[in-house]
Amino acid sequence: MKVAVIKYNAGNIRSVDYALKRLGVEAVVTSDKEVLKAADKVIFPGVGEAETTMLHLKESGMDHFIKELRQPVLGICLGMQLMCRFSEEGNVDCLGIFDTDVKRFAPRKHEEKVPHMGWNTISCLKSDLFKGFTRDEFVYFVHSYYVPVSEFTAAETDYIRPFSAALHKDNFYATQFHPEKSGEAGERIIKNFLEL
């Protein structure tokens, strides 16, 4: 199986590559569109800022390319947010794969800190990504923006308000949390993605 990780102006590529190696998978980290198109699975990671990253994707033509991929694609954190229609982070149009917007957390109480950083459980698991997953397992989040619950929600969690922990539409899967930093539970999610 050929697995490719999209290389672009964003962080956490190394931790995704390391998580794949722990599963015995040698992935290619690349921005080469032909290599990405030929891969069996594509991972679209991201840590960074939506406006700057979308600008980079547009300049490289990667914005249209990602939307045209037909194999299973997994967006992680910022990767998930960029798959949405619009982000309040920089008020930028995104890829529009998921017809929903990314919003900034608005804390109602002093103890509700932004960013949402740390371990949380997820529920309403509606995707093969979560095969063998139980409600009491924790995954790791680091984000200041969220995607509201919608028809594309494949898993949800609650911090300040309920929101989408994962999205799914056709061949596109996405997690707001970092499976590559979520221990055994996260490894199982990556393994499930590779088995799709």
UniProtKB/Swiss-Prot annotation:
Residues 2-196 form the Glutamine amidotransferase type-1 domain. One of its GO terms (molecular function) is imidazoleglycerol-phosphate synthase activity. IGPS catalyzes the conversion of PRFAR and glutamine to IGP, AICAR and glutamate. The HisH subunit catalyzes the hydrolysis of glutamine to glutamate and ammonia as part of the synthesis of IGP and AICAR. The resulting ammonia molecule is channeled to the active site of HisF. It is found in: Cytoplasm. It catalyses: 5-[(5-phospho-1-deoxy-D-ribulos-1-ylimino)methylamino]-1-(5-phospho-beta-D-ribosyl)imidazole-4-carboxamide + L-glutamine = D-erythro-1-(imidazol-4-yl)glycerol 3-phosphate + 5-amino-1-(5-phospho-beta-D-ribosyl)imidazole-4-carboxamide + L-glutamate + H(+); L-glutamine + H2O = L-glutamate + NH4(+). Heterodimer of HisH and HisF. The active site is at C77 (nucleophile), H178, E180. It comes from Bacteroides fragilis (strain ATCC 25285 / DSM 2151 / CCUG 4856 / JCM 11019 / LMG 10263 / NCTC 9343 / Onslow / VPI 2553 / EN-2). The keyword Amino-acid biosynthesis applies. Its EC number is 4.3.2.10, 3.5.1.2. Pfam families: GATase (PF00117). InterPro entries: Class_I_gatase-like, GATASE, Imidazole-glycPsynth_HisH. HAMAP family: HisH. This is Imidazole glycerol phosphate synthase subunit HisH.
